[in-house]
From Swiss-Prot:
Organism per entry: Arabidopsis thaliana (Mouse-ear cress)
Additional note from the record: Knock-down mutant (chl27-t) grows slowly with a pale green appearance. Also confers severe defects in chloroplast development, including the unstacking of thylakoid membranes.
Top-level class of the enzyme under EC nomenclature: oxidoreductase
Cofactor(s) required for function per UniProt: Fe cation
Record text on subunit structure and interactions: Part of the FLU-containing chloroplast membrane complex composed of FLU, CRD1, PORB, PORC, CHLP and HEMA1. Interacts with YCF54 in chloroplasts.
Protein name: Magnesium-protoporphyrin IX monomethyl ester [oxidative] cyclase, chloroplastic
Entries under Pfam families matching the protein: Rubrerythrin
Similarity comment: family membership: Belongs to the AcsF family.
NCBIfam families the UniProt entry points to: AcsF, PRK13654.1
Disordered, as annotated region: 1-23, 36-60
Length: 409
């Protein structure tokens, strides 16, 4: 799960999925500095990496509104949705074909490190080094959250629908592999995420199953477009290839693409999630949440994208447009992101959000900060609402051709 829809505030009444030892699914070793997460309304501070860290030191990362979330759902409803005796719309042949795709495990031997990683990390210094550490932290957290959700779904659906359950388990394998690879990347900076602590300590956002489908489909597809775009750019501009993890993105992104295809098949099996006016409204809502989250996040990290030779806003708009076009094949309605006004609204959101962050950094009293934030929050909310209310693009269909596994480049 390469990208997260994080604008929805997490709620704590839902406990985390019960996994006895999630760390065993993630290859790696102990490192000099272990990073933990803590909840906070303030933006995440830069993370410093140093070889002088004392063994066993715990380093906290602040959790903000846009931090990748961990998700849980109504597993009993999931079991009913995929009960073949209840749901006659399930295309078992399609799921069998998908299962064979996942069993093939095209990337089984892909994520193998070499000495380039440590050498490249040692060359990264100053602000760019800090930015890369944060990139690895956030990416690892997002992938690990996908691992936890998919692993639990695989466990809970085993009796109801063994085929779908096995696919979820194999997707959790992919996510664990990604998270482990990213966490090993942190070892190049003498850091590591405490994934066991994350499992127990993080708050979980509850989504109903249909919302899980919308959010995770978008997360996987936007992750595909982010990875393949960065890979293509660096292949054409090798002088910006400052860390070897990007060389793995071509194959890596196909995991994201296959995961998205699976969620597309899940939604096709539940036409009630796609064929009414409520589905159109929710589709637009989740598209907007994912796009806005990415845009606001990335605009706070322009140094990272500039460091690899990309214009942040141009990169984001390319990813948003391509993701939207892909999503239009399945969602009944999508946003008109190719309307120039949509980008103008995103840019105005960035201005308001940056001012909100700046207020948080001041030494003003809390009530003064609150007063200063009110007009900015109002402005940000009005821009988000205005973007949502823009005339949508009617799209999607539940009349699909038979599934044919393919690679998209």
């Amino acid at each position: 799960m390469a990208a997260e829809m994080a604008l929805v505030k997490p709620i704590s009444k839902f406990s985390s999925p019960k996994l006895s030892n999630p760390s065993k699914f993630l290859s790696g070793r102990r490192f000099s500095t272990v990073i933990r997460m803590s909840a906070s309304s303030s933006p995440p501070p830069p993370t410093t990496a140093t070889s002088k860290s004392k063994k066993g030191t715990k380093k906290e990362i602040q959790e903000s509104l846009l931090t990748p979330r961990f998700y849980t759902t109504d597993f009993e409803e999931m079991e009913q949705l995929f009960n073949t005796e209840i749901n006659k719309n399930l295309n078992e042949a399609e799921f069998e074909a998908l299962l064979q795709e996942f069993k093939t495990d095209y990337n089984q031997t892909h994520f193998v490190r070499n000495k380039e990683f440590k050498e490249a990390a040692d060359k990264l210094q100053g602000p760019l080094r800090q930015i890369f550490v944060e990139f690895l932290e956030r990416s690892c957290t997002a992938e690990f959250s996908g691992f936890l959700l998919y692993k639990e779904l695989g466990r809970r659906l085993k009796k109801t629908n063994p085929v779908v359950a096995e696919i979820f388990s194999l997707m959790s394998r992919d996510e664990a592999r990604h998270a482990g690879f990213l966490n090993k990347g942190l070892s190049d900076f003498n850091l590591a995420l405490d994934l066991g602590f994350l499992t127990k300590a993080r708050k979980y956002t509850f989504f109903k199953p249909k919302f899980i489908f919308y959010a995770t489909y978008l997360s996987e597809k936007i992750g595909y477009w982010r990875y393949i775009t960065i890979y293509r750019h660096l292949k054409e501009n090798p002088e910006f290839q400052c860390y070897p993890i990007f060389k793995y993105f071509e194959n890596w992104c196909q995991d994201e693409n296959r995961h998205g295809d699976f969620f597309s098949a899940l939604m096709k099996a539940q036409p009630q999630f796609l064929n009414d006016w409520q589905a159109k409204l929710w589709s637009r809502f989740f598209c907007l949440s994912v796009y806005v989250t990415m845009y606001l996040n990335d605009c706070q990290r322009t140094n990272f994208y500039e460091g690899i030779g990309l214009n942040t806003k141009e990169f984001d708009m390319h990813v948003i447009i391509e993701t939207n076009r892909t999503t239009a094949r399945i969602f009944p309605a999508v946003l008109d992101v190719e309307n120039p006004e949509f980008k103008r609204k995103l840019d105005r959101m960035v201005v308001s959000y940056e001012k909100l962050l700046a207020i948080g950094e001041t030494d003003d009293a809390s009530f003064i900060k609150t007063l200063k934030r009110i007009p900015l929050v109002t402005s940000l909310a009005s821009e988000i609402l205005a973007a949502y209310l823009m005339p949508p693009v009617e799209s999607g269909s539940v009349d699909f051709a038979e599934f044919e596994p393919n690679l998209v480049y």
